[in-house]
Amino acid sequence: MTTLAQYLNTNAASPALNDVITTVTDVGKTISQLLRKGALADILGEAGNQNVQGEDQKKLDVLANDLLLDALAKNTHCAGVASEELDDAIPANAEGSLLVLFDPLDGSSNIDINMAVGTIFSILPYQHQGKVSENSDFLQAGNQQLAAGYLLYGTSTVLALTITDNVVMFSLDPDTNDYVLIEENVTVDADTSEYAINASNYRYWRAPMQQYIDELIAGEIGVRGRDFNTRWVAAMVGDVHRILCRGGLFTYPFDTKYANKAGKLRLMYEANPMSLLIERAGGGATDAVNRILDIEPTDIHQRVPVVLGSKNEVDYVKNLHLNYAEK
């Protein structure tokens, strides 16, 4: 039985990376405990304010964010922290060598109905040790990530992590409070018959995405010649976890629902870390035209369309968009 601590000691590229991942996952234990208490800990309901994204914050959004910020500020290897919940990145320790980005509680609308939520994190190198970090230091393409992962708080608490060229999974043992390795080489099947999308936005999508979903709905009587099933957790972390476990496709495509927003999902806090996990498990991740991990960010809260999961299906969606652009 291999614990997370043992795995990191053997596989982490540096003691600094080991320590920062440990800090994040230790906070995950606290968040997991709070979620188990639910209403008994008075953590349900609205916090009464909005985040930088214009979204209403839940009480646990704020609490999870504060727990991560406080813990990382005390970590000497962390030079700065950027959160989906805050306007700007926060400097930590100028001598640190790492930057941490996170979505403290993805899918927080699920909290009050006792459904899956999670914490997503990304770790980048810091290039200016000795100087106070600022927003621009975080503007690195996803292919520069040193580590990425998520904690899924469901019927059990699961950690998915990549620090090498593969993806591993751990489960939090409630008896020992240790993360225990349960899968050491996660792979995503190239083909799938499951897809996840919020179909209520159909009228706002571009024509190739509408065509794609029309084909899936037509199933065996359409051009695809086989049936597909829809799955939707309303939390990216839950949908991506399902894909890592049994394949599938997840997309939150470009839409015109809100002006000046290319998509719903944030590049730095959601798309980049999830894309790294999916690609290293053998899947694909694109904005429907470009590889997500190659996108050069211009803002820490930049939004992008996302299509990720089983590679053959991702490639199919990308080809539909490319063919449409050539017409």
UniProtKB/Swiss-Prot annotation:
Substrate binds at D106, G107, S108, S109, N198, K264. GO terms for biological process: fructose 1,6-bisphosphate metabolic process; fructose 6-phosphate metabolic process; fructose metabolic process; gluconeogenesis; sucrose biosynthetic process. InterPro entries: FBPase_C_dom, FBPase_class-1, FBPase_N, FBPtase. It catalyses: beta-D-fructose 1,6-bisphosphate + H2O = beta-D-fructose 6-phosphate + phosphate. Binds 2 magnesium ions per subunit. GO terms for cellular component: cytosol. Its cofactor is Mg(2+). Pathway: Carbohydrate biosynthesis; gluconeogenesis. One of its GO terms (molecular function) is magnesium ion binding. Keywords: Carbohydrate metabolism, Cytoplasm, Hydrolase, Magnesium, Metal-binding. It is found in: Cytoplasm. The keyword Transmembrane helix does not apply. Pfam families: FBPase, FBPase_C. SUPFAM superfamilies: Carbohydrate phosphatase. Its EC number is 3.1.3.11. Homotetramer. HAMAP family: FBPase_class1. NCBIfam families: PRK09293.1-3 (NF006779), PRK09293.1-4 (NF006780). This is Fructose-1,6-bisphosphatase class 1. It comes from Psychrobacter arcticus (strain DSM 17307 / VKM B-2377 / 273-4).
